[in-house]
């Protein structure tokens, strides 16, 4: 499936819920959000039907996101169903990690192949401040996230740790987060803050600045091609796993894993964009920066046949925007260099 610019669209990100067990400051407003009613979100069966249609159109990688995807009941069932589709090569999940460790084996057996775990600090008090978790709730603390990382590795899942650097919240933590890749075959990725939603209220730190700081601490970095550290460690990797999307990776002396940078603001990567997003409300979004999209829930619930849905998806994808304009927003003061 190609868009109007000839970009091959083979990656589908699915938000399975709007709910989350944390209240991260750059993601959720202080007053919280009003959760969607049950009937407003797609059922797991509806999600699977859409994935099946899009697999026939060329989708090869699926990522489950939220909210926090693991608060959605019966999610392993969806993973298992998607895993059974012949064209799907990778099923990944992005999670805050607090609920993952006890379920790691369940998800691996269902067909999960990779997990991205969000972690912005190793300091317990700062973690509570960023995430809004209760001081008494040890199950949702930073230790639970570290257990998730190790549990995922034990299950031979490919692990990426995502960190969003912000001057106001975790500017002092970058070296500690990066050190997680010193003795673990993981990718630690620093993602430039995008000036949308609550993120507009914070100041991100550029990838250039983070790399400079890490080199002062750990030594000169060498740029490396996008190859999974598990493959480097000896595990055979599917060729599709070698495509790491927009991240640029570096190897530091003595590190088992890699350090990556995703720089949507300072280094726009729209020309290589290969993804579309399905919201939990059933809208197919073609770009994060634009609200317009295709309302698939209405089609599903009005009795549309698969062929009609396929044609509507193809028509929408052909209109995928050429690029975002987050950089213009960031020019108002949202990124330090």
Where are these regions (language model features)?
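Radical SAM/AdoMet-radical enzyme domain recognition
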Residues: 41-63, 71-191
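Auxiliary Fe-S-binding modules of radical SAM enzymes
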Residues: 1-11, 179-183, 193-196, 200-337
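Canonical Radical SAM [4Fe-4S] cluster-binding loop centered on the CxxxCxxC motif
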Residues: 4-44, 286
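A short acidic, helix-capping loop that chelates divalent metal ions and anchors anionic groups
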Residues: 32-37, 123-131, 196-201, 295-297
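Conserved G/P- and acidic residue-centered "switch" motifs that form tight phosphate/ATP-binding loops
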Residues: 68
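Residues that scaffold the ATP/ADP-binding catalytic core of kinase and kinase-like folds
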Residues: 23, 27, 72, 125, ...
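Glycine-centered loop/turn positions within well-structured domains
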Residues: 22, 124-125, 268, 294
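Conserved, mostly hydrophobic/aromatic
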Residues: 16, 20, 24, 64, ...
């Amino acid at each position: 499936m190609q868009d109007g610019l000839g970009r091959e669209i083979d990656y589908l990100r699915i938000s399975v819920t709007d709910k989350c067990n944390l209240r991260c400051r750059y993601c959720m407003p202080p007053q919280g959000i009003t959760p969607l009613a049950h009937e407003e979100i797609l059922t797991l069966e509806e999600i699977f039907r859409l994935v099946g249609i899009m697999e026939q159109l060329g989708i090869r990688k699926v990522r489950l996101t939220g909210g926090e995807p693991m608060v959605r009941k019966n999610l392993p069932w969806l993973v298992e169903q998607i895993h059974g589709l012949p064209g799907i090569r990778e099923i990944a999940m992005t999670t805050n990690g607090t609920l993952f460790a006890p379920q790691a084996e369940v998800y691996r057996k269902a067909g999960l192949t990779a997990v991205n775990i969000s972690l912005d600090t190793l300091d317990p008090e700062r973690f509570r401040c960023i995430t809004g978790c209760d001081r008494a709730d040890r199950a949702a603390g930073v230790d639970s996230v570290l257990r998730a990382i190790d549990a995922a590795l034990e299950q031979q899942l490919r692990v990426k740790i995502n960190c969003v650097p912000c001057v106001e919240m975790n500017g002092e933590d970058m070296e500690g987060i990066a050190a997680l890749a010193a003795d673990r075959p993981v990718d630690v990725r620093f993602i430039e803050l995008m000036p949308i939603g609550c993120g507009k209220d914070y100041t991100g730190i550029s990838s250039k600045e983070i790399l400079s700081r890490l080199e002062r601490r750990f030594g000169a970095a060498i740029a490396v091609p996008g190859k999974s550290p598990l493959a480097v460690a000896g595990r055979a990797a599917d060729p599709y796993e070698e495509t790491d999307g927009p991240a640029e990776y570096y190897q530091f002396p003595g590190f088992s894993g890699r350090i990556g940078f995703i720089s949507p603001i300072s280094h726009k990567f729209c020309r290589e964009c290969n993804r579309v997003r399905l919201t939990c409300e059933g809208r197919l979004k073609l770009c994060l920066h634009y609200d317009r999209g295709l309302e698939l829930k209405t089609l599903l619930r009005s009795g549309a046949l698969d062929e009609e849905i396929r044609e509507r998806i193809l028509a929408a994808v052909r209109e995928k925007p050429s690029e975002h304009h987050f950089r213009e927003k960031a020019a108002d003061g949202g990124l330090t260099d």
